[in-house]
Amino acid sequence: MKSAVIQLPGLNRDRDMIAALTKISGQAPVTVWQTETELPEVDLIVIPGGFSYGDYLRCGAIAARMPVMKAVAEKAAKGVLVIGVCNGFQILLEAGLLPGALMRNASLKFVCREVKLQVANANTAFTRAYAPGQIIRCPVAHHDGNFFAAPETLARIEGEGQVAFRYAEGTNPNGSINDIAGIVNGAGNVLGLMPHPENLVEAAHGGTDGRALFESVLGRAA
């Protein structure tokens, strides 16, 4: 599987993502700086977490307007798989590649802890290696992860099976509507989620619950 990891000022989870992708696919991803206007031929593009541009204006608002994001949008329109994790999810929303918005956590506090996730749709390119309804562990670390969508948008997201993951067992850390933790676009090739699956891909680091997400993508690329 060929993959690319986008790099922007303030993103600090790129090394974790690179390590996870390398371990699972056996091939190190290429890194692409924000000023690039073209992307290499890859199976997967990942925008990792962090605090791009210090979260000024709105989380992801400045990053979404960098040249590389036009290239990401062009690849997504052609069906290339795209994952945005945490700040990467915020960037995808700001870029218009996913519906809805992420607001300040309901607690108004930064939350860093483990949560439980339910696989809400196991029939996406990112979740096929999970069982339907499977409960997994995953860490979160964010201040603005409270997912919101207008009623008509929310109805479409729910009705078309675009919710990939929900917070489960009362572990919603941010007040997200309908416990939404991750969604896909209408075409099913763009995923945004607040939790960090890249941090649970090997037993030595506390578990492997995040591994199946990347294995799902690997299976599609094979």
UniProtKB/Swiss-Prot annotation:
Query: What EC designation does it have?
Result: 6.3.5.3, 3.5.1.2
Single GO term (MF): ATP binding
State the active site.
Answer: 86 (nucleophile), 196, 198
GO CC entries: cytoplasm
> Which HAMAP family does the entry mention?
PurQ
Keyword vocabulary terms for this entry: ATP-binding, Cytoplasm, Glutamine amidotransferase, Hydrolase, Ligase, Nucleotide-binding, Purine biosynthesis
UniProt-annotated location(s): Cytoplasm
Which pathway is this protein assigned to? Purine metabolism; IMP biosynthesis via de novo pathway; 5-amino-1-(5-phospho-D-ribosyl)imidazole from N(2)-formyl-N(1)-(5-phospho-D-ribosyl)glycinamide: step 1/2
Q: Which Gene3D superfamilies match?
A: 3.40.50.880
Where does this chain mainly localize? Answer: cytoplasm
User: Which GO BP annotation is one of this protein's?
Assistant: 'de novo' IMP biosynthetic process
Tell me the gene name: purQ
SMART domains in alphabetical order: GATase_5
Q: Taxonomic classification, please?
A: Bacteria, Pseudomonadati, Pseudomonadota, Alphaproteobacteria, Hyphomicrobiales
Q: Which PANTHER family match?
A: PHOSPHORIBOSYLFORMYLGLYCINAMIDINE SYNTHASE SUBUNIT PURQ
* SUPFAM superfamilies (UniProt xref): Class I glutamine amidotransferase-like
By its UniProt entry, which Pfam families does this protein fall under? GATase_5 (PF13507)
**Its catalytic activity?**
N(2)-formyl-N(1)-(5-phospho-beta-D-ribosyl)glycinamide + L-glutamine + ATP + H2O = 2-formamido-N(1)-(5-O-phospho-beta-D-ribosyl)acetamidine + L-glutamate + ADP + phosphate + H(+); L-glutamine + H2O = L-glutamate + NH4(+)
User: What's the subunit arrangement here?
Assistant: Part of the FGAM synthase complex composed of 1 PurL, 1 PurQ and 2 PurS subunits.
PROSITE patterns in the cross-refs = GATASE_TYPE_1
Could you tell me which NCBIfam families the record lists for this protein?
Answer: FGAM_synth_I, PRK03619.1
| Signal peptide (UniProt feature, chain positions) | none
Identification of the protein by name: Phosphoribosylformylglycinamidine synthase subunit PurQ
Function as written in the Swiss-Prot or TrEMBL entry:
Part of the phosphoribosylformylglycinamidine synthase complex involved in the purines biosynthetic pathway. Catalyzes the ATP-dependent conversion of formylglycinamide ribonucleotide (FGAR) and glutamine to yield formylglycinamidine ribonucleotide (FGAM) and glutamate. The FGAM synthase complex is composed of three subunits. PurQ produces an ammonia molecule by converting glutamine to glutamate. PurL transfers the ammonia molecule to FGAR to form FGAM in an ATP-dependent manner.
